[in-house]
């Protein structure tokens, strides 16, 4: 029996990145030997065991053979005669097909070290094309390691295109697509994930609402980058700099979906694209089974981001109504989230990357003023039932009006 550290732990250590999870491959053993040694079996479809002390995963070396459609249609073979090289060959990328023995020596049968040095994401073998989930995984790796200068090998991108055009991605479940997307949204450069999907044709299949934005022009005066798809990825990049939250990043990604519905004869203007985009947000989220809290913020951002841009022009009643509409009294974090997504929208434009966004500050200040109006004082003044809410709203409007007169510049 020989045990090797494999995959991401070896890769990230070589890149000088923190190692989170360690996975091990066991060569020359059987399930019974593992059980006799005190390991606990957890894999049903293939033999994976937990170490009795560390609880890290130890898998018997195995090969996989395509036996059906999609990413679950595989038959596994695990036996003492399966070599380490056999096991590593089933991995997706060469940089993930690295192993380390107990002496610290790196075993590299597929030139993963060379690709690591050259910052290349390259598939190990043609078997890559048998698993459609790998298209999303490679896009996610491209986003995760973009800051280190990694790019996808030409032949790997070509294979991803072939898989997409062959309809392989249609076998992916919504849950798996969302899981990979959510993970990509946590990376430093989530926009790279969607750009890679577009490059291989997968964006049109999995995110048609986003793909439809490419080629749709916006007024050059406000959008020097002109193309709405490019602007969308720029805003996502900016959102990633402003917030680590997946819901903020996803909402920013979806903020302009309504522009994809504008008839070409009305281009480059997109009047009413915010409210129009709400239905597309709901459609996308329902299809991918996006969690409700993330969906709800994306709907609000689509509907209200343009309103926040015009903040100095809003009257106090409209501002308080906005807080009502986003349910800020029960979910105060939404004020900050809307301020961040609107800022990402403004700064996600060519030449505006370092622009100030005072509307975000004014929104936050107005919220502090509105929520500082005490409910207790209204109740103690003798108001009852619906009168309490009406009087509370009136006082909030008055407080915001007073603040706006002193602190918020008059619209030009």
UniProtKB/Swiss-Prot annotation:
Mg(2+) binds at residues 21, 23. Residues 228-329 form the HD domain. The gene is cca. Optimum pH is 9.4 for AMP incorporation, 10.0 for CMP incorporation, and 7.0 for the phosphatase and phosphodiesterase activities. It comes from the Bacteria. This is Multifunctional CCA protein. One of its GO terms (biological process) is tRNA 3'-terminal CCA addition. NCBIfam families: PRK10885.1. CTP binds at residues 8, 11, 91, 137, 140. It catalyses: a tRNA precursor + 2 CTP + ATP = a tRNA with a 3' CCA end + 3 diphosphate; a tRNA with a 3' CCA end + 2 CTP + ATP = a tRNA with a 3' CCACCA end + 3 diphosphate. Changing residue 306 to A: Still possesses phosphodiesterase and phosphatase activities. Magnesium is required for nucleotidyltransferase activity. PANTHER family: MULTIFUNCTIONAL CCA PROTEIN. Its cofactor is Mg(2+); Ni(2+).
């Amino acid at each position: 029996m020989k045990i090797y550290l494999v995959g991401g732990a070896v890769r990230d250590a070589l890149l000088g990145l923190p190692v989170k999870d360690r996975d091990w491959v066991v060569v020359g053993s059987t399930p019974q030997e593992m059980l006799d040694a005190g390991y606990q079996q957890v894999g049903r479809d293939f033999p994976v065991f937990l170490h009795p002390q560390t609880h890290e995963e130890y898998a018997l070396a195995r090969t996989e053979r395509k036996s059906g459609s999609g990413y679950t249609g595989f038959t596994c073979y695990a036996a003492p005669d399966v070599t380490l090289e056999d096991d590593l060959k089933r991995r997706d990328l060469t940089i993930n097909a690295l192993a380390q023995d107990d002496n610290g020596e790196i075993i590299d049968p597929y030139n993963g070290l060379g690709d690591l040095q050259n910052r290349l994401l390259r598939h190990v073998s043609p078997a890559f094309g048998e698993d459609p989930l790998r298209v999303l995984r490679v896009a996610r790796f491209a986003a995760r390691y973009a800051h280190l200068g990694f790019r996808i090998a030409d032949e790997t991108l070509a294979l991803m295109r072939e898989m997409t055009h062959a309809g392989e991605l249609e076998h992916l479940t919504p849950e798996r697509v969302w899981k990979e997307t959510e993970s990509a949204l946590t990376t430093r450069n989530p926009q790279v994930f969607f750009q890679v999907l577009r490059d291989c044709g997968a964006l049109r299949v999995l995110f048609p609402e986003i793909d439809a934005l490419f080629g749709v022009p916006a007024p050059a005066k406000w959008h020097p980058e002109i193309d709405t798809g490019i602007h969308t990825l720029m805003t996502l990049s900016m959102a990633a700099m402003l917030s680590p939250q997946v819901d903020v990043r996803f909402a920013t990604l979806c903020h302009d979906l309504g522009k994809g519905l504008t008839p070409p004869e009305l281009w480059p203007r997109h009047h009413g694209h915010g409210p129009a985009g709400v239905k597309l947000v709901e459609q996308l989220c329902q299809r991918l089974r996006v969690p409700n809290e993330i969906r709800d913020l994306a709907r609000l951002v689509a509907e209200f981001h343009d309103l926040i841009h015009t903040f100095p022009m809003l009257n106090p009643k409209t501002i308080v109504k906005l807080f009502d509409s986003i349910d800020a009294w029960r979910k105060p974090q939404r004020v900050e989230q809307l301020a961040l997504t609107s800022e990402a929208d403004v700064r996600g434009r060519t030449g505006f990357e370092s622009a100030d966004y005072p509307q975000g500050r004014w929104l936050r200040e107005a919220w502090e003023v509105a929520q500082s109006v005490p409910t207790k004082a209204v109740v103690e003044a003798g108001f009852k039932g619906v009168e309490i809410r009406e009087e509370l709203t009136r006082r909030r409007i008055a407080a915001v009006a007073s603040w706006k007169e002193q602190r918020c510049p008059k619209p030009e």
